[in-house]
Amino acid sequence: MNTDMSRRQFVGLAGSLATVLGLGLVGCGGGAGKGSAAGSAAAKDVKGAAESKKLVVGFDKSYPPYGFVGDDGEYTGFDLDLAKAVADKQGWDVDYEAIDWDAKDTLLNSGAINCIWNGFTMEGREDDYTFSEPYMLNEQVLVVKKDVGIKSWDDLAGKTVITQTDSAAQDVLEGDQKDLAATFATLDTIGEYNTAFMQLESGAVDAVACDLSIAQYQLAAKPDAYAQLDKPLSSEHYAVGFKKGDTKSADAVTESLKALYEDGTVKDLCDKYADYGLSFDNWVLK
């Protein structure tokens, strides 16, 4: 989903927090809904969205098409546009906070953000967050270099596979697909997907495990460089994650998402980001 793959920068938690706390607040208010990529907000006591009438969205700015830095240097993406549309429906303001993905739980629990909205997989995390209803179908997939003879999972035996730290793909390969991962020479993790795909293109690794949207974006950008294996690692759903117990905010967002589907806004946004591999067919909340 988007060019800010630092969604889960592979740095220590203390470093992640220092980075986030040191950056300036980007306020979106009722305007265009896009903050400057030059900085991020300082942590502060943020109430739930429904109570404060403000969405403070934590997102990974290198995760196209859901959240990334546009050509104009402004934050953009499907989920950010969707968050702005929801805020408008509810009469809320919206702030965008580009975060280190490793620090998302600390930032949410501290109140520096009041939701995580950026291609956020809900399966396996239900005990840790209060979620909106799921809105988008997603898959975890494997991407390899084109024309190197890797056509199936079996061909990855003895190969080096890389994924993003604390990603859904890592969870799958360390959980339901751990037997597959055991056949790899190594399963490496890295802070952001842009670098992972650079390593794949250079031959430093043999495959990248990632969200379908990331794969589609990379394949669209470099169709002669990469190929996606046919068999997905898993299927899952995206939802908006709130601090555990913030049911009021989650319900309000779900209500607005359904309304945005009904009035055609969701279809328009899916079409806007179609070139990034996003499909209206994957929308599930109706």
Q: Residue spans of the language-model regions?
A:
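Bacterial lipoprotein signal-peptidase II cleavage site
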Residues: 25-40
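Bilobed "Venus flytrap"/periplasmic-binding protein-like clamshell domains
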Residues: 61-64, 75-88, 120, 141-194, ...
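Periplasmic-binding protein-like
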Residues: 61, 137-144, 216, 220-255, ...
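Extended ligand-binding regions for polar small-molecule ligands
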Residues: 29, 80-89, 159, 165-168, ...
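Short helix-initiation/N-cap motifs at beta->coil->alpha
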Residues: 80, 96-106, 187-198, 236
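A ligand-binding cleft/hinge motif common to bilobed small-molecule-binding domains
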Residues: 103-106, 119-128, 172-175, 201-235
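Acidic, polar ligand-binding/catalytic clefts
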Residues: 84, 93-155
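N-terminal secretory signal peptides and thylakoid transit peptides that target proteins
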Residues: 2-18
